[in-house]
């Protein structure tokens, strides 16, 4: 296999890494491997290597050879990950959460095993060894340094845990995300019980972790350069019902402020995704009686 030496953009951390194609990356993934993927929802998920793994699975199946992997993700993903691998019948096991119609059809037809565990428990369960070892971690990055510092893109998920546990790490270096995204993340792994302490986050601006994930650079078997946007969520347009819900919530919060039950400077919020959440946040943003406020979020996405 030809090894290409390239410099990452115009970074001051000029480094020589083994840059490979998506197809070459797929050669590091074997039948029965447990593979962990970065990201949380489609944000931060690998975009091109999963498709190459799917093509490899199809080719192996046509030869009469088995090829399926165990899949571990931070949450649901996009069609380029769950969809591609499901349609290729390349999944033997999937956890913790999914929302892809093709994967759902595969699971409901008993084509793969599925563990619908709460996604907040997955990283700890992996560290405990409950779900077996992680053979390969495939992660999307905005930047990576020669000493093994990986800067995630717009989602993290279980990236720190799978990178620490995996034997091999494949990086998709997505040039669509600027390397200046470094500093946006606050990556922190709590100690496992019985040694766990409180997580000392008291305001959205508190920082307790790192702006990158540090790995053993010897485990990075290759870097695949990409220039791919995140897959967007497909929600139907807001209708009268969802807008009415949004207005009701905004009016309720304004009433609580005026009654003194909420402080005038308001309080931090955390929102889910979907039409109702979009309507609520939209109506809050348009309401002049609601001041600017802080928001907790684990991912940035168009949803």
Where are the regions that the model predicts?
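Residue-level detector of intrinsically disordered terminal segments
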Residues: 5, 13-14
């Amino acid at each position: 296999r030809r090894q290409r030496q390239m410099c990452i953009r115009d970074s001051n951390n000029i480094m020589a890494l083994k840059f490979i194609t998506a197809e070459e990356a797929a050669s590091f993934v074997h039948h029965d491997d447990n593979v962990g993927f970065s990201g949380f929802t489609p944000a931060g998920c690998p975009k091109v290597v999963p498709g190459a793994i799917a093509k490899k699975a199809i080719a192996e199946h046509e030869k009469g050879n088995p090829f399926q992997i165990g899949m571990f993700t931070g949450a649901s993903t996009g069609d380029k990950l769950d969809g591609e691998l499901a349609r290729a019948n390349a999944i033997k096991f999937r956890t913790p959460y999914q929302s892809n119609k093709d994967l759902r059809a595969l699971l409901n037809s008993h084509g793969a095993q599925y563990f619908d565990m709460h996604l907040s428990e997955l990283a700890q369960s992996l560290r405990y060894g409950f779900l077996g070892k992680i053979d390969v971690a495939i992660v999307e990055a905005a930047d990576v340094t020669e000493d093994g510092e990986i800067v995630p893109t717009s989602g993290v998920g279980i990236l720190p845990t799978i990178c620490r546990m995996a034997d091999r790490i494949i990086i998709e270096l997505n040039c669509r995300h600027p390397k200046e995204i470094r500093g946006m993340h606050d990556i922190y792994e709590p100690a496992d019980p019985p040694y766990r302490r409180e997580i000392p986050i008291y305001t959205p601006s508190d920082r307790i972790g790192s702006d990158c994930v540090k790995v053993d650079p010897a485990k990075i078997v290759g870097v695949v350069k990409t220039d791919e946007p995140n897959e967007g969520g497909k929600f139907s347009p807001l209708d009268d019902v969802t807008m009415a819900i949004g207005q009701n919530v905004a009016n309720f919060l304004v009433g609580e402020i005026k009654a003194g039950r909420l402080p005038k400077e308001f309080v931090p919020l955390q929102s889910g995704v979907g039409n109702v959440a979009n309507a609520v946040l939209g109506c809050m943003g348009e309401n002049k009686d609601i001041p600017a406020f802080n928001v907790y979020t684990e991912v940035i996405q168009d949803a």
